[in-house]
A protein has these predicted regions:
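Flexible "stalk/tail and boundary" regions
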Residues: 1-9, 13, 23-80, 84, ...
């Protein structure tokens, strides 16, 4: 399943976050949350996480960059389950790593879902409205 769309929710005082129904369908009841690039967290379905783990396992142990990548992704990963209200509990360590406060943006980006602190997300990506820059970026990427 490909995840798309942007949703805004609040993190409650216990660190629980409502997962939009559209995302729950593709995630299933059990999935993985880990750190991601850019200062956000990423959620992967069990199937997508297994595929990512297979790629990481295939990396050469003797390569220090490969070991660093494994530490970054696997060392912070946790398995999460939805509660009866469609929420997950994001561990304190992950909330701190992503600087999550109350207002959260969930962003479907293909094979995973990014979890952003809303202020950080809007500060970092407020310039997505610059069409000339987007056109140039798309062309450079071959899109």
């Amino acid at each position: 399943m490909s995840f798309t769309g942007e949703y805004h929710h609040n993190l409650d005082a216990k660190g629980r976050l409502i997962i939009p129904a559209k995302f729950r369908e593709g995630l299933g009841n059990e999935f993985t949350v880990t750190r991601s690039l850019g200062g956000c967290l990423a959620m992967y379905s069990a199937e997508e996480w297994e595929a990512l783990e297979d790629k990481l396992d295939a990396l050469p142990f003797t390569n220090s960059k490969a070991r660093d990548l494994k530490r970054f992704l696997l060392g912070s990963a946790c398995t999460c389950e939805l509660d009866k209200q469609g929420r997950i509990l994001i561990p304190q360590t992950l909330r701190e790593k992503a600087d999550l406060k109350k207002d959260i943006v969930l962003l479907g980006v293909g094979n995973n879902i990014e979890i952003w602190d809303a202020d950080k997300y809007f500060e970092k990506y407020h310039d997505f409205e610059d069409e000339e820059q987007l056109e140039q970026d798309w062309e450079n990427l071959g899109v």
